[in-house]
Amino acid sequence: MSDKIKPSEAKRTEILDNVQQMTVDTKFEELGVGTETDKTRAFLKIQEGCNQYCTYCIIPFARGPLRSRSLESIRDEVGKLVAAGYKEVVLIGIHLGCYGKELAKEGKHVTLYDAVKAALSVEGVQRVRLGSLESVEVEPRLLQLMAEEPRLQRHLHLPLQSGCDKILRAMHRPYDTKRFTELVNEIRAQVPDVAITTDVIVGFPGETEEDFATTLPPPPPPAPAPLHTFSYSKRGVTPAAELREQYDDAVNSERAARLAKGDEGLHPRMLQGTVGKVDEALL
C-alpha cells in the first residue's frame, strides 16, 4: 500500500472506534445451548462483557459492556438442558459476579444469587455449579444458599493472579493479598467444606524475582486446592502491553514450571481430605 492511500494512525483509530461502536452489543444475546445426550454437564452462559479493565486483559475491548441473560431465559434454558438429559448445569460468564448489574438502570434489581435461584427452581435439575467469579463479588446470601442447598455445588473458582500486592496494583485487580485472604476465610467460615481453586499469572511485566517469590510456593489462600497457572501473554491495546519490562517466553515458562512444582503437594492434600467420605457421582 502506498503512503498516499495508507490511512494515518489517527484515521485508523477513528475507523476502529467506529467499528467497535457498530459491533458492541448492549443487550444480552439469549442464544440457546446445544445439547448432546451422552453428556452429564452443560455450560450455560448467563453474562457477557466486562468493565473491570485489568491492565493485561483484552476482553473489555473485545466483548463490550456488561449484559445479562434474563431470569426467564435462564429457567427456560435449564429446563431444556434437563429435558435433554443433563444432570448438572454450570452457570458461566465473562464477569459472572456482575450478573444483573446493568439491569438496575431498567429498575430490575437482580444479582447472581437470583440467577442461581432461577436455575435451581427448574424441576429435575440435580446440580448447579458456578464458573469463575471475583472474590469481592461473592454475596453472603449466595454463601448461605450454598451451605443450605445440596444441589448447589460447594466449589468456587476465585482468581488471585498474583501473591504480590505491587503486581496486583499494576494489574488493576480489585483487592490486595490481605483482602483476598480475609474474603477466603469468610467464605470458609460460612461454608466450611467449600472447595476453592484459583488462577495465577506469572511473568507480568515488571514482576521481579522477589515479587515472584511472594507467590511461590504456595500463594496466599485458597489452599489446599490445585492452582491454574498461566504465563503472561502480551495483548495489544492493553496498558500492560506498553510496560517497558516485558519478559521473554523462557522466563515466563520457567516461573510457571516452578509454581506448578510448588503446587504439586496441594492436590494430594485435597484428596487426603476426602478419605472415608461418600459422595455422589453423575454418570
Which residue stretches match the model-derived regions?
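Proteins enriched for Cys/Gly/acidic motifs involved in redox and nucleic-acid/cofactor modification
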Residues: 1-100, 111, 141, 146, ...
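Residues in well-ordered beta-strands of folded domains
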Residues: 22, 131, 282
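Short aromatic/hydrophobic contact patches that present stacked aromatics
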Residues: 43-45, 168, 201, 280
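Conserved SAM/AdoMet-binding glycine-rich loop
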Residues: 83-209
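Hydrophobic, well-ordered secondary-structure elements that form the walls
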Residues: 158, 199, 219, 227, ...
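Structural detector for short beta-strands of small beta-barrel domains
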Residues: 273-283
